[in-house]
Swiss-Prot record:
Gene: namA
Function: Catalyzes the reduction of the double bond of an array of alpha,beta-unsaturated aldehydes and ketones. It also reduces the nitro group of nitroester and nitroaromatic compounds. It could have a role in detoxification processes.
Keywords annotated in UniProt: Detoxification, Flavoprotein, FMN, NADP, Oxidoreductase
Gene Ontology MF term list: FMN binding; NADP binding; NADPH dehydrogenase activity
Coiled coil: none
Protein name from the UniProt record: NADPH dehydrogenase
Family the UniProt entry places it in: Belongs to the NADH:flavin oxidoreductase/NADH oxidase family. NamA subfamily.
Enzyme class: oxidoreductase
Positions annotated to bind substrate: Y28, H164, A165, A166, H167
Organism: Bacillus velezensis (strain DSM 23117 / BGSC 10A6 / LMG 26770 / FZB42)
Pfam families: Oxidored_FMN
Positions that bind FMN: A60, Q102, R215, A307, R308
Reactions catalysed: A + NADPH + H(+) = AH2 + NADP(+)
Length: 338
């Protein structure tokens, strides 16, 4: 039987050489606090391309300065950021990988000086700053900032854009009734709470015709929060808008007890793939090639997003191939070892 983990996957005009995706993970390493890439970022991402990862998604990258989780996050709110990202995309592609970027706004989870913003003036927890409720004008401005960030990502040479609508950040905050208590057109019903994400998707697509992913938190793990049924509905709307893949994570909107085990989020990807009829990515404690192959062979997801295991092992693709008794190409410089 062919090893599906090492088969290509094509979305629009982008072909990823295998099904392994480096999930976006914040490195908090923009030490000049200007949102720009540092030498560490170049080494970090390029090394995973050398390690034969099919698609590398750059960590949550803020569309405005107050949209950062911390002041050491990456940013793409200025044309000054384009040059660094262009160098990164060129080098990653030179090693045979595709590269995407996750566009993000931290919302009420921003840990910054000055005002922070959210759909409603509800802090993340008792220790967190209370955000200012966004005005309609600020919402429209933020949507335009996502659009401008997408245009910069295109100029920098990215293959794929992912919108971050998970983990309790701004887009997720609009979606969930736990964090969105608005009474205007951006709050209340499912349709209204989806409006911010939906309008952002439309704005991004005005300047971006490449593959578009959205990361979601498929469950808030608490009463009156979002669950998988809600996200199946949202995924259907995203598909209608032209989103190509749903990256299925979960949690982090509020403090919650989560039963974590290997592959604990895979069922979310499976259900959305089946019921919304859209491609999905599975993520969360997927640490072996055997586990990844099972997910793909049973059509539970289309791509495997690997996070911490790729921090531990930049050559995860090689390790997975050995586990699956299959051969994959190696960088010519590494032939003597592989």
């Amino acid at each position: 039987m062919a090893r599906k983990l090492f088969t290509p996957w094509t979305v629009k005009d982008v072909t990823i050489k295998n099904r392994i995706v480096m999930a976006p993970m914040c490195m908090y390493s923009s030490h000049e606090k200007d949102g720009k890439l540092q030498p560490f970022h170049m080494a970090h991402y390029i090394s995973r391309a050398i390690g034969q990862v099919g698609l590398i998604i750059v960590e949550a990258t803020a569309v405005n300065p107050q949209g950062r989780i911390s002041d050491q996050d990456l940013g793409i709110w200025s044309d000054d950021h384009i040059e660094g990202f262009a160098k990164l995309t060129e080098q990653v592609k030179a090693q045979g990988s595709k590269i995407g970027i996750q566009l993000a706004h931290a919302g009420r989870k921003a840990e910054l000086e000055g005002d922070i913003y959210a759909p409603s003036a509800i802090p993340f927890d008792e220790q967190s700053k209370t955000p200012a409720e966004m005005t309609t004008e600020q919402i429209k401005e933020t949507i335009q900032e996502f659009k401008q960030a997408a245009a910069r990502a295109k100029e920098a040479g990215f293959d794929i854009i992912e919108l971050h609508a998970a983990h309790g950040y701004l887009m997720h905050e609009f979606l969930s009734p736990l964090s969105n208590h608005r009474t205007d057109e951006y709050g209340g019903s499912h349709e209204n709470r989806y409006r911010f994400l939906g309008e952002t998707i439309e704005a991004v697509k005005e300047v971006w015709d490449g593959p578009l992913f959205v990361r979601i938190s498929a469950s808030d793990y608490t009463d009156k929060g979002l669950d998988i049924a809600d996200h199946i509905g949202f995924a259907k709307w995203m598909k209608e808008q032209g989103v190509d893949l749903i990256d299925c994570s979960s949690g982090a909107l509020v403090q919650a007890d989560i039963n974590v085990f290997p592959g604990y989020q895979v069922s979310f990807a499976e259900k959305i793939r089946e019921q919304a009829e859209i491609a999905t990515g599975a993520v969360g404690l997927i640490t072996t090639g055997t586990m990844a192959e099972e997910i793909l062979q049973n059509n539970r997801a289309d791509l495997i997003f690997v996070a911490r295991e790729l921090l531990r092992d930049p050559h995860f693709a090689r390790s997975a191939a050995k586990q699956l008794n299959t051969e994959i190409p190696s960088p010519v410089q590494y032939d003597r070892a592989w």
